Amino acid sequence: MSEQEKGKGDLDDPNSKNTKCPDKFEQKVEEYLEVLNELHLTGRTSGFCMRNFTVEGAFNPKFQIRSFFAQLLHPINIIFRTGPKRDIIPLVKGFDGYLQPGSSLLVLGHEGSGGSTLLKALCGIVEENERLNGSLHYDGLDYKIAHSQFKADLSYCGEGHSKVATITVRRLLEFVCSCRLPASKYDHPRSHYIRRICEIIRDAFDLGDFYNHRILRVFNSGDQIKVDVAQTMCARPLIQCWDNNMRDFDSISVIDILSRIKVLSHKLGTTLVAIVSQASDRIFHMFDMVTLMYEGEQIFYGPTSRLKPYFLDLGFIPAKHSTTVEFVTSLTYPEMRIINKKHQGFIPSTPAEFRECWLRSEDYAKLIKFMDRYEENHSDIHAFKDAKFDQTRLQKFLRWLNSNPCLIPYRLQVFATAKVTFFQYLHDYSYIATFVFTYVFQALMLGSLFYNLRNESSELYSRGSVLSNAIVFTAIQTMSEVDIIFLKKSLFKEHRVQSLYHPSAALMGSSLVEFPMRIVVVTMYDIIVYFLSDLKRNARSFFIFYLFTIVITFCMSAVFRFIALLSTTAEIAALIGGIGALVLIIFCGAVMPVQYIGWWFRWIAYANPVNYGYESIMLNEFDGREIPCSLMAPAPDTAPIENNFCLATAGRTGTSIVSGYQYLQVVYQYKADFLWRNCGIILGFAIFILASSLILANFIRYDRESVHIPEFQKRKSYSQVASSFLIEPQDKPPSQTEPDNKKVDVSTTLSTNDNLVLCWRDLNFTVVTKTSKKQILTNVSGYLKKNTLTALLGENKSGKSVLLRILSQRGIAGSVEGEITLSGLKNPKNLRKRIGYVRKNPLFISEYTVRETLRLHAALRQSKQRSLSEQYAYVEYVIDFLGLGEVADFIVGDMGKGLSLYHKRLLSIAVELSARPGSILLLDEPANGLDSQSAWMLVCILQKLARSGLSILCSVSQPSSRILELFDMMLILDLNGNTVYYDTMGRDLSKLVNYFKRIHGTNEHSKDTADFVLHCIQFLKQGPEFDYAGAWASTNTHKQIIEHVNFIMDNPELTDDDFPNETRFMTSFFFQIYKISMRNFVAYWRDSSLLRARVAFNIVAGLIIGFSFYKQGVGVEETQNKMFSAYMLTVASTSTMNGLQPKFIYFRSIYEQYEQNTAIYSRTAFIIAFFLVEAVINCCFATLFFFGWYYPSGFYEFNHNIPFYGGFAWLMLMIFTLYYTTLGIGIATISPSIGTASIISGTAFVFIQYFNGMIQLPGVIVGFWKWMDALSPYKYFLEGMIGGVLHDAPITCEKFEIHYVDPPPNYSCGEYFSSFLNSSGHGIVYNPEAYSSCQYCPYKNADELMVGFGYHYNHKWRNFCIMIGYTAFNLGAAIALYYIIHKTPWKRLAARFVPD
């Protein structure tokens, strides 16, 4: 018998009982095997063998916070090599071990010990900064070959891995199965086997009909892990690695899931490697082999039966009642080791010494002997390689055998990804509705604005405007591809690791689905716009227009997908996308004809597909059109037509008809022969970019990750930090804030003088849905007294979190009945402030340090009677008390970055303590996901807090006996929310054990008392075989507790007078704004990628607009180009407006999920503080934009008073910056997600800018929309801006802009035009003394040209004040809307709390 077989745990063993899967599951697995046999897909197995295997990473081990300025200097550091050097650090050092097919391995070690890195390396997931050394082979097949050609056989499932969120279980499993079922000839169609396999797997995991129509996004965590296992079962990997996926589950659920995985491993012969936090003895003995890692060093590898004896022989002894896992993981914490004093030999202390002892041990020698034997059986590597290829020949398409790790041909990959994309959109109703609404709404807006255009020369501008807006809108809407691709990048990475498909196949498949969707909405858009605006009414013209909008959509969709693939971060993608949209609009030919673009940028116009599309639809509309003149000049009523001309661009003398083609030649220099040529050019662009994207997709790295390194803030001393902008000047160390330098005792500081008793009686909680009514809590009663630590136990969905939220008075949707008192006082004032509550996964500002986070909460939540220095001194005592001193200046970070999970849990406790809530503290599963030793240390800290005077109620889901012994009392709930135990537990948990022995009628129980208790809890869900709640209710202990609860409530020790009349918030409104503004500013300052993207956009956009209109002349068309230069400022503002919304929604999520319920600050202060920081940042960056735009555009050349006009233009830009900042905040306030905010922002921008005076001239706006002309803020901004920069700017007509006409006999040109000039009020005759060939220019200065757009220079200060009013209105509306939406029932329903 092999060593691994000896190490296997017996399922009937007391330490592993009740780990057997349901019979239904084993039956379904047998059915699954029958199908695989029928398909000839069984018999493939593989183990692995590692020898001196090392994973090295290159990084800077002391990674300081890089602020915005530091990031700006980063390129210089790279060039001159002045930045921090990267060290090569071994993450996994010299790992030895092997695992036979069908066996299982448990990887132990504290967080950061290298376990996750080992599992990823085993599955071929190696990051850019990592490299593998040593030997690793899979039954003789070298890891380099396996990782490149057989990656699909290696499955890694990490915590929080990506899924297709808007798809049903059935469709997901069919997708995975279709990607892993070879394209061979079978007895039945391939689709038949796919459906059959998926039905079996869904039945096996109880994911039947109820889940078929539910998308994965609404699943709870328990169902999600079932889906993960089912997905892995469909993929049929040879080696499975599970990286702590079950960290949020209770032990019962973990055992259930692992038992299913074990059965699959045994039946299919797959090899299992797993990391399980807080593994009980039952879980531990489910594995065959175990390895223990200590800071990257392997200090044990062998059968599970040898783990504990090995370390006992080394001279260590376990703590009382500790599990095997607790014992061995405690050895990786030097302060937790218990040394056997009778041991005579050497006792290791450092990781290197543990490693040396392991290398000299007999267990290591046995391991090497078994490894040698294993390698001998697979010594002929090449022969096994050939055999391996022979075994997989059926499972690979022959042409791809030696190069492609995917099992199906490319065309089937495209089909599978297209199918899953289709169903993904089919179930994403909100996206489809928003997608269609956006196109239809914009079409109705544009079509109605240009409704029924007349065939007159006065509407030549309008006809061109509707065409330009139509083509630009369809192009700009494809920018959503950037967001779509970025959402899919993590999915691409995961599926690429699993070798389900090539990323290029997914890109092609999604294009095949999304492009027809766009064709549908573009068709609707084109029909509405084309026929409402009365463009050329014939079939040929319509279908040409339709064709070019379609090809432009296709081309620009490919362009923005290419941009998203090239971008490494969302900020870079937004930057490139924003610049791309700006360039697309400027150089499309509509804003400025190509001939006016400087040679330095003209190549961009030729590389812009929209330019060719605009040219073609303009030719399609104007070529062959004869347009009657709206106004003949100068004397149509008194002089013959030969002495008049048409006052329109391209108007001719002696005729009242304007040729549409002549108009295009004069204004744009378009040629009719280019119409179909342009179509070919656009398609060429599209095909080239699409092909480039498909090639690029297979070679770029998705979702790059780096080694987890905490970031810290460099602090030389407290006094230096106090002088910086990060911390207030009052901030000083305790020795400086207290003149007498008196040391405050920690225990006294943390305890309180009150003896508050939290008491609750007959609590019931019910959640009502559309289809059912569920009782979560049923008649729960109890109390918390001082110096007591109480455990709250129960399965998932038993109501633990609900009870804690009700007791803490945190918001929860549902019906609550019962009484809650504080020392007998019902409904005391501000009860929420007197109870500390640590939620399950609290959210903090990731850019803040630990110390800064605690100081913020102390300053905002402690009483105003304490000075800021006292509050900060108290924070230092909390840091010392909880042992956070070493990480006090580390960045908190996000998921997977920043602080370790253990320190984040300590931080959540420290935050509540720093607020000094009172003597009551409630915690919702604070130890979840921690390793056994970290969980024990955290509960020890809770015990220490309880002994210092706090009353603590803490829910736990994966306790061990050693952890349970730290509690004083235990409250157990069943799945119906009934109390089944609430009492002390006795010495060594004897009272608790005896109670459950008595009601079960047994005298035996597991050696692990916690296992026995959890085993009893497991029976609570197996039906009404026994009334556990009734049994407890009949006990004397329960009756005594109820009597005590009644006594407390009937004899209150407090009155309302005992509580001071406090306001809802502890601090003043302005202090809240100040502290939150400083917090937000620090977060922005340290989120350097965001600020870099913004500053780069403002500089680049300003320079692009400025130099696009550089050295424009003084002709009519060139002056109009300068007006469009100012118009482009409004277009550029949309990128900044969209850029602030993700940050607002991020801050809002923290506020709504955590800070709001703790009454830290008001929502008004939240919005104003966010606005102040955004206003400062945006105004600073807008100033950079202004200089890049104003001076290259040459506006200063026309102003005789440069300081005033330039200063006024800057002032208008600043108030406009504040306007769109508040507009973006207001839209984000009412938006549930970033995507929705982006869509609403785009729709609002287009709606407002349609009435800015430059899209449709005010004089020809249809009657229905005339009211919007007076309401558009962009109209007032552009009027003020353009009036300021172009006031008194002279106009000298170019030759083609001058109208030539002969006056009647005996009339000079001046005499002939005098009446017309007086009546029209604009224009100039260049040769008034001449009697022939009069030269008339329509405008003599820019002010006359601006009048046609409805702009007047004299309105400049009025416009400035109106913009101030709009800004104030937006800010007030944002505050009001946030309050209204938060208070409405549907908002509470949308934020409904899902019980645990």
Curated annotation (Swiss-Prot):
InterPro entries: AAA+_ATPase, ABC2_TM, ABC_transporter-like_ATP-bd, ABCG_PDR_1, ABCG_PDR_2, P-loop_NTPase, PDR_CDR_ABC. Keywords: ATP-binding, Endoplasmic reticulum, Membrane, Nucleotide-binding, Repeat, Transmembrane, Transmembrane helix, Transport. GO terms for biological process: transmembrane transport. The keyword Metal-binding does not apply. PROSITE patterns: ABC_TRANSPORTER_2. It is a multi-pass membrane protein. Residues 1-22 are annotated as: Disordered. CDD domains: ABCG_PDR_domain1 (cd03233), ABCG_PDR_domain2 (cd03232). GO terms for cellular component: endoplasmic reticulum; endoplasmic reticulum membrane; plasma membrane. Residues 73-320, 758-1001 form the ABC transporter domain. ATP binds at residues 794-801. The keyword Repeat applies. Belongs to the ABC transporter superfamily. ABCG family. PDR (TC 3.A.1.205) subfamily. This is ATP-binding cassette transporter pdr1. It comes from Schizosaccharomyces pombe (strain 972 / ATCC 24843) (Fission yeast). The gene is pdr1.
